[in-house]
Structure formats: C-alpha cells, structure tokens
Curated annotation (Swiss-Prot):
Keywords: Aminoacyl-tRNA synthetase, ATP-binding, Cytoplasm, Ligase, Nucleotide-binding, Protein biosynthesis
Family: Belongs to the class-II aminoacyl-tRNA synthetase family.
Broad class of the protein's primary localization: cytoplasm
Species of origin: Streptococcus pneumoniae (strain Taiwan19F-14)
Gene coding for it: hisS
The name this protein goes by in its record: Histidine--tRNA ligase
InterPro entries recorded: aa-tRNA-synth_II, aa-tRNA-synth_II/BPL/LPL, Anticodon-bd, Anticodon-bd_dom_sf, His-tRNA-ligase, HisRS-like_core, HisRS/HisZ, HisRS_anticodon
GO cellular component: cytoplasm
NCBIfam families, alphabetized: hisS
Length: 429
C-alpha cells in the first residue's frame, strides 16, 4: 500500500499556502472593519449538534457527513459546515448574557468535511470562511452582512459576481408555501428524480434546489414563495430590497433558491459568478432566527454567510487574478569557507531580529550555486561572507537587481541594516 493522502484531500504546499494566508488575512482585515471578532470551535462535534440543526433529511446529514462512535461510545461527526458549531458555542458559553454587547459578531476559518465526489473546487476536506451575527432582527443587519460579503469579494478581485436574493419568510409563511408546493408537485412525482421523490415526502422545498434536469423541468411553473408571504415576512423582505437599492447594490430575485440547510428563514442569498459557462456560487448565507433557541438558548436572531476557500482560489485563478503576494527575501548571505560559518549564523540572526527576512547558505556550496539560490528566493540584497571578510570586519552588500554595492562593517549590519537597505534603494516598513 502506498502511503498517500486520502481521496478528496490535498496538501497545500508553500507556493499555494502563501495565497491562502493572503486570503485569510484579507478576510480578517475586512471583517475587523465591521467589528467582527474571531471564534474557533472544534473540528468535531456531537452528531446531534449537526443533524438536528442542519436537518435530518438534508443531503449533508443523510449522505455526506463523516460520523463515527469514539472509544467512549459517543456519536461524533466531523463538522460539515460552520454555523451550527458557532451557534452551539454561543449558547454553551452564554454569549447571549446581558453583559455581552449586541449584536454579537463572530467570524471563523477552518476545515470542514463532507463525503462527496471530489472535483475542482470541491473536496472532502475543504476550508470555509464564515461570519455569524447574533441579536439583531433588523433588516439592516441582513443588508450589512450581504454588503460585507460583496465588499470582500470586490476588493479581493472576484469579477462578474451577481447577487441572487430570496426569502423563505417566517415559519407560518414557509408552512403555507410548503403545502402549496406539495399540492403542485404530487401529481408530477413520477417525473421527478429518485432523490427528489424522497425530498417531496421529507422536505419539498429541497426539490427546488435540485440540479437534475427532470427536476428543473418539473419546477418551472411551481408556485413562488413570494405569493405566500404574510405581512411580517413581506415587510422584512421589502426593507432588505429597499436598503440594498439605497446602497446601489444590484440583485436578482431567485425564488427557486432555498439553500441546502434547514435552519434558514427570511432572507437568503448567494453570490454567483460564471466560470467557463458554468454558474459557481462563491458565497452564500442568510437569516436563521430560530437556531439559538433550538440549541437551548433564548429567542435570538441570527444572520451569517460562508464561502469556500478552495472555490474562491479556483475562481481567482480562472479569472486571471494575481494576488499581491510578497515572497522576496530581503537579504541572502552567501557563505565561503568554514571560517565564516559561525559569523554567518550570528549575522543572519541579527538581521532577522531587526525585522528583515533573511537566509544564508548551510551547504558549503560553490558561490555560483549560492548566487542562484539568491535569485530563486528573489533576494533584494546579497552579502558574500568569507574568512577574509570575517577577519577585516568589512563586507560588501549588493543590490541583487541593480548590482549597486556598498562597503560596510559587520557591526553596522548587525545593529542598523535599515540604513544600508535604504541606501541601496529599498524601503523598510
């Protein structure tokens, strides 16, 4: 047996991980502007945390979850999404308490797990960035969160994104619509896919979300949720739409969009872009006002979204967006002879402690090979340190692009390299 990574996973190697770090850092910066703070939850939860909140009949629970019994016979699942664990944490840690500022705003980043057919941008271990806002039923919260997602996508460089918007109404509106959908689909049951025939019995709204051709045909003339909204639901949705328009945010009403999780109510949304003729959802979310109470907390409004990092990076690559990643070394020290080994170690460490990104040769190679390494690392400056330089205490620092040189003491480099760096045309932060 070859020792290889499991199917549906990937190794994120240094050239790629730099992109991941940029995206995650960029998201943190945007979220901070909106007063969000990071929360980190376990990657595994009790099975019921996911099954009861996401929905027993959803594809995630019935087909895709990684679940097992641990050595204490506890039913455990690897988290397939981020909202339910954050809500569980919110309730368990009593973050609904009066002394905690409302609304409470959290973001998270980390791996999720679903057993599904691996494909580009969709793996069995995937990574999600998401936000959750608790304690505000104000439709302005819906809009602020949607706009924050749009803000992130625009500034990171995603092109051609369209906002798809729908409402699922409150529980009363949803129940009325559910019955109308059953009445419409029941005569068409035999024309539906096998999965949608099952969904019709368990959760008919999920038929609207099916990607199967026969199901798409069947729901073409299905009733619209917009015809079943009561006054409260209509008022909320109208307010969301008006505020989006006030902020100049274009949107498309998509009444067949229901999202894959059972906990949503009122506003739901997706940001969709087209790649090679296919629509790809890059970010999605919505309101879930009943979920905190479902976990044993008080009635608390909630709104959030999630986006997949793998898919985001895939879209950026397909759209030719180059992330502004700085990988260059500030200094490379080429070492000549055993007599320079100790001093090279002292020097590279002194540079790092001054805040410079520095590397040295450890392999006793010929200078030509060391200079090539400096080029591979895109080193801005180059120091050649041999036994004669150690004895004299003087060394040449070279701009590795222009070949301009300055002669300086080793003591100056160890104490104030910034001055030399700037003299050679580079600027320190």
């Amino acid at each position: 047996m070859k020792l290889q990574k499991p199917k549906g996973t990937q190794d994120i190697l240094p050239a790629e991980s730099a992109k991941w770090q940029y995206v995650e850092g960029f998201a943190r910066e945007i979220f901070k502007r909106y007063n969000y703070a990071e929360v980190r939850t376990p990657i595994f939860e009790h099975y019921e945390v996911i099954s009861r909140s996401v929905g027993d009949t959803t594809d995630i629970v019935t087909k895709e979850m990684y679940d097992f019994y641990d050595k204490g016979d506890r039913h455990i699942t690897l988290r397939p999404e981020g909202t339910a664990p954050v809500v569980r944490s919110y309730v368990e840690n009593k973050l609904f308490a009066p002394e905690v500022q409302k609304p409470s705003k959290f973001y998270y980043m980390g791996p999720m797990f679903r057993y599904e057919r691996p494909q580009a941008g969709r793996l069995r271990q995937f990574h999600q960035i998401g936000v959750e806002c608790f304690g505000s039923s104000n439709p302005a919260t819906d809009v602020e969160t949607i706009v924050m997602a749009a803000h992130f996508l625009k500034e990171i460089g995603i092109q051609g994104v369209k906002l798809h918007l729908n409402t699922l109404g409150n529980p009363e509106s949803r129940a009325a619509y559910r019955q109308a959908l059953i009445d419409y689909l029941t005569p068409l049951k035999e024309t539906l896919s096998k999965d949608s025939q099952r969904r019709l019995e368990e959760n008919p709204l999920r038929v609207l979300d099916s990607k199967e051709k026969e199901d798409k045909v069947a729901v073409e003339n299905a009733p619209s949720i917009l015809d079943f909204l009561d006054e409260e639901s209509q008022t909320h949705f109208d307010a969301v739409r008006q505020m989006l328009e006030n902020l100049g945010v274009d949107y498309i009403i998509d009444t067949n969009m229901v999202r894959g999780l059972d906990y949503y109510n009122h506003t739901i949304f997706e940001f969709i872009t087209e790649i090679e003729g296919n629509d790809l959802t890059v970010c999605a979310g919505g309101r879930y006002d009943g979920l905190v109470a479902y976990f044993g907390g008080p009635e608390t409004a909630g709104f959030g979204f999630g986006l997949g990092v793998e898919r985001l990076l895939l879209i950026l690559e397909k759209q030719g967006v180059a992330l502004p990643i700085e990988n260059a070394l500030d200094v490379y020290i080429a070492v000549l002879g055993d007599g320079a080994n100790v001093k090279a170690l002292e020097l590279v460490q002194a540079l790092r402690q001054q805040g410079f990104k520095a590397e040295r040769d450890y392999l006793n190679r010929k200078l030509k090979a060391q200079f090539k390494s400096a080029d591979v690392f895109a080193a801005k400056t180059l120091i050649t340190l041999g036994e004669s330089e150690v004895e004299s205490g003087q060394v040449t620092v070279k701009n590795n692009q222009t070949r301009e040189e300055v002669q300086v003491s080793l003591e100056t480099i160890s104490q104030n390299f910034s001055e030399i760096f700037e003299k050679l045309g580079f600027y320190t932060q």
